[in-house]
């Protein structure tokens, strides 16, 4: 499967927290996802991933808040980024 990296960013939030965003464009959708993006957006605090949006093959689009996994309705890459940053803001406040 061919893939093209669209976004690979790391944002330091503070001394003990960072955000990592990786988005790939695939030649065909992953099993469980209707779109051609493969993504992982994560908030890591004190070395622990406390928030993550991803779409691993077979599971489809979902998010992890703490240890809880919740289905996520993917609309577009921009909405995905907005939703993720909104969750990061909630986590931090």
Give the residues covered by each predicted segment.
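The feature represents the first ordered module of a protein
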Residues: 1-62
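Short, compact, well-ordered microdomains
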Residues: 68-93
């Amino acid at each position: 499967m061919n893939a093209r990296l669209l976004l690979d960013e790391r944002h330091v939030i503070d001394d003990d927290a960072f955000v990592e965003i990786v988005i790939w464009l695939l030649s065909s959708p992953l099993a469980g996802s209707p779109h051609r993006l493969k993504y992982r957006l994560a908030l890591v605090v004190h070395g622990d991933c406390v928030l993550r949006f991803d779409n691993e093959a077979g599971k489809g689009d979902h998010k992890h808040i703490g240890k809880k996994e919740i289905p996520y309705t993917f609309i577009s890459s921009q909405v995905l980024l907005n939703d993720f940053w909104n969750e990061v803001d909630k986590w931090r406040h």
